[in-house]
């Protein structure tokens, strides 16, 4: 079967309507911030335990030291809580700048420390912050789809994740989540049921260093997204449903 080079999403990817680059910076890992992140992880684990029946596969694949780019599919609002609850460290989070307009999220993000990004725009400050994080040996988590899926399955990837991995020469760690749709979890909670959720950590891989130019970047993005698709059940593969066929 022929493989499409650039799968398309059902609707155009969002572009940030605001431009506040002064807010984009790499969080400083002070002692107090490390403590806040630890407390936040404990809180996330409590929420996950109460609201879901989470099954975790492949945690041994997660790198314990050294820089890495963690890529996840994005089904719903609970994804960040689930990922931060199960991962053994406190990765840097790349988040859309619009989240700062929600007071509660702004408070949490400022305490944890988030690298803000302006989607659909050449955000050099976000790139610089991410590359500095890698130089310091930190791990970064990002959703390469660029938004929460509007179809309930994998959408086409944007090139940001591939660019960062290639630029920094760091491994990509694929993490997939199923069952985290907000509506599904909300409906089960109303019935006093915990929602079954599955997370899978795949083996880290290095993108081809020969990838150059826009075509090479798109190819690297395709590799990332197809790797995520192969970790997902067929119903969640979306525009990458052709993999393994």
Specify the residue positions occupied by each region the protein language model found.
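A generic structural signal for alpha->beta connector loops
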Residues: 51-53, 90, 111, 137, ...
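Hydrophobic alpha-helical segments typical of transmembrane helices
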Residues: 35, 39, 43, 79-82, ...
């Amino acid at each position: 079967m022929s493989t499409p080079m650039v799968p398309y999403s059902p609707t155009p990817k969002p572009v940030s309507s605001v431009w506040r680059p002064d807010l984009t910076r790499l969080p400083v890992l002070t002692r107090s911030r490390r403590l806040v992140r630890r407390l936040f992880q404990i809180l996330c684990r409590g929420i996950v335990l109460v609201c879901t029946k989470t099954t975790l596969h492949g945690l041994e694949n997660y790198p314990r030291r050294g820089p890495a780019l963690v890529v996840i599919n994005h089904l719903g609002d609970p994804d960040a809580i689930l990922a931060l609850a199960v991962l053994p460290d406190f990765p840097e989070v790349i988040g859309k700048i619009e989240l700062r307009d929600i007071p509660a999220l702004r408070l949490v993000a400022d305490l944890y420390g988030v690298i803000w990004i302006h989607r659909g725009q050449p955000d050099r400050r976000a790139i610089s912050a991410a590359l500095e994080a890698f130089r310091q040996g930190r791990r970064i988590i990002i959703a390469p789809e660029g938004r929460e899926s509007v179809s309930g399955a994998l959408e086409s990837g944007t090139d940001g994740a591939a660019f960062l991995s290639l630029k920094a020469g760091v491994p990509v760690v694929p993490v997939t989540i199923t069952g985290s749709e907000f509506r599904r979890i909300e409906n089960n909670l109303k019935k006093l049921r915990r929602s079954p959720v599955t997370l899978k950590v795949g083996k880290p891989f290095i993108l081809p260093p020969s990838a150059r130019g826009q075509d090479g970047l798109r190819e690297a993005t395709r590799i990332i997204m197809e790797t995520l698709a192969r970790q997902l059940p067929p119903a969640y593969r979306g525009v990458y449903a052709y993999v393994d066929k």
